[in-house]
Amino acid sequence: MDVKECIGKGLLQRVPPNRELSAKEWREAELDMAEAKALLKEKRLKRSTTTSYYAMFHAAKAVLFKLGFREKAHYAIAVVLEDLAKRGKLEMRFADDFRAAMHAREGADYHYSYSEETARSLVSIAGEFVTEMKKLYRE
C-alpha cells in the first residue's frame, strides 16, 4: 500500500500543516522516551517496550503534521515513512524500525510477549528514531 491508497482507504488524511500539533507530539515523544528509559531501569519490561514504541509514534506524528497528514491508523505512519525513504529523505531502516517497534508493542500488549532484550533494544532504537525524526522535521 502507498500513501495515495492510505488516503483513499481513510487511513490517512490530508490536513493543513500544523506546527502547534507537531509541538504537542514532540512533547509526548520526549516524555515517552524518558519514561521508557526509567521503566527499563525498573525492569518494567512490558511498559518500557510499549512506551518506547509510543515515543516513536509521537515523533513520527510530529513529522506527519508538518507534512500535512493526520494518521487514522498506526499502519499509515509506516507507509509514510517508507515513502519518505523511497524519496531519499530517510534511511529505510527507520521505517523498518518503526514497523518492528509496532509489532513489539502489539506483542507486549496483546500476546504478553516481551523480554528484557527486546525492551533494551527498543529503548535504543527509539532514541535513534526520535533523533532522526527531529532532523527530518527541521528540513
Task: Indicate where each model-derived feature is located.
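Terminal alpha-helical segments
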Residues: 1-139
